[in-house]
Amino acid sequence: MTEDDAIDVLICGAGAAGLTLAIDLARRGVSFRLIEKMDDPFRGSRGKGIQPRTLEVFEDLGIVDKIAASGGYYPHQREYRGDGSMRDVALVEACEPVPSEPYGVPLLVPQFLTERAMRERLAELGHAPEFGCALVAFEQDGQGVTARLANGGEEQTIRASYLIGTDGGRSFVRQALAVGFPGKTLGVRAIVADVTLTGLSRDVWHRFNEGSMETQISFCPLTEKGSFQMQGPVPLEGDIDLSAEGLTALTAERTGRTDILIQSVSWASAFNMNARLADSYRVGRVFLAGDAAHTHPPTGGQGLNTSVQDAYNLGWKLAAVLSGAPETLLDSYEEERRPVAASMLGLATRLLEDMKRGEIRRGREVRQLDIGYLGSSLSLEDPQRQARIVAGNRAPDALLKGAAGQPARLFDLFKGPHWTLLEFEVETVGLQPRKGLHIQSIGQGGDLIDNKNQFRDTYEVASGDRILVRPDGYVGAIVSQGDVAALEAYLHDVGLKTGAAARR
């Protein structure tokens, strides 16, 4: 093993979580390798719901437009009843974008297209996943992780400061750490398949026998080459014929129709639904993220989105510690993300029970815009402050005007791997500039003008308030005019030191 074999981060698993982390580390200049034991990229549509909060993450990572162009909005669902009647219903509550929430509803994007867009973005940043490369062993000490990789019959030993397991529900990393994965199998087995077919239109999501766990079956039109995602519960025991002929027979049995013919199957899977949560997200210098840390039933479209946001939370913290921030900053990853996963597990399981009763409509609860880290060790807040937006909340967008008269958005200010300090009508000299912190003054004579009072009304700020927004778009701190010392201490604790302090 040579110095060339030493990297900052080894990411094991090139799905949505691993790709998100890789993109974030790449734009921060962190050295890493992203390995994937499979020989080729995942080719199924499985995790197809992209929630509004994840779209905000993708905007920051530079891929939201490509993701949106790869998919579309959820179609209405056409419910076919046993008496031959049918009705069309909305699957998603209508919600128009507003300045504070620019993405109102989820998008339907096949997972393999989402991951393709992520790989393309990673390539723009000069990196690529290493397919066919497996992690076969690792051990750690106080300074890093020694990992043994196997690729095409050849083995290599490398050294990394940190190892991240994003290798799915059957995670090798989690099992090697002996981290428990408690939870339960939910007593539901289902199939999901990407198919082409004849006999159904592409303008609606077709669902037969809604609410029946014995005979329900559905066909959701996808954007890719006229295909559909076919879904349905199946018996807990026994083999399932996932060929075109087998799925055609299953369709005829459940719908009573012989005109729906499955012509081809590009990907198919039969799986048991589980709800499980890792006992720990961190063991020393090894972390778990995505499905390696939590598995959800697919109801509500939470799994992929939660995985992306795990990685988005972890990436900036790894980069900060590698640049000199206190190691304890990494403890906040599990502190913040494990409760979110526990909540999402509960939500997805409740939605599964709703589906069994025939209720499939989804509202704000699945959009992940209200997820926050209130009470986190990284949330600095005056306990007396009463407002809608407090430290730990998602930082909303708002429309402003630049000092030169040009339109401006908060999200454009947040975009990138930096922290953002918003100073509202601050008259006194405040914090010194430093690397990694962008300071924006809002108000007359400032960098930005709150000409429509959107910022003031959304954040409920008073003159002299300072709002610190983290690199992942959450409010880290809100302090008033006289609390600059507390804010300075906070910045020091997350590695944002002034020039002189940073050199010490």
Which residues are covered by each model-predicted region?
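Glycine-rich FAD pyrophosphate-binding loop
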Residues: A26-G47
